[in-house]
Amino acid sequence: RNYKSPRSNLSELRIVLLGGRWTGKSSAGNTILGREEFVTEGRTAQCVKRQREVAGRQVTVVDTPGWRKSWSVENTPELDKQEIVHSVSLCPRGPCALFIVLRVDASFTETDRRSVEEHLELLSKTVWRHTIVLFTRGDRLGDRTIEQHIEAEGEALRWLVGKCGNRYHVLNNEMRGDVTQVTELLEKVEELVARNSGRHFTVGERMESWEDHVESDRLHCNSNKFITVGIH
């Protein structure tokens, strides 16, 4: 079942969109804000932040560079990883929610699952308390419900949805005029904030994780140097 909880009525909401390339992050940002704020042609190379009043709330959306589908975090360019980590700093006091953006018409394999997990945990191991799965291209569901899609897609997608506390939402980016889908999304963000007792994802959580990642890379490099010296 989709997540339902008492919610806080907030005047300001801050959202970060994360996910692989070509999943529809920029289009989702435009749908949420109700106008063309993000460029949808070509690849997003740097974080982009846009703000607008939506349904009586001041909404901030941060779009981020996507990683290649199925890529391990080790294969993702360092600049892209830095931008992903930087994204939360663009939200004063931290984002209220981080959306993992997936296309409803694309398969989601175990390799995809590991890729999402690795990239999300660049931010923190605790990031999952603040995440919601956002499915784009909702029109491709046809007669199926999103619950039927999640069940049919397999264990990898069910794991991801479960890891996000069974929080998910569907957007049809072809129906920008449908304000209900956006209002319901914002309400789910408010429910998430209420569940977290008003806490947002903090920069402190993010920095601790990034420092661990940098230290791991340093040790890996030193290990490789040691092996090289040993060979010679």
Model-found features: residue ranges?
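A short beta-strand-to-loop transition that corresponds to the Sensor-1 phosphate-sensing loop
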Residues: 65, 101-104, 135-138
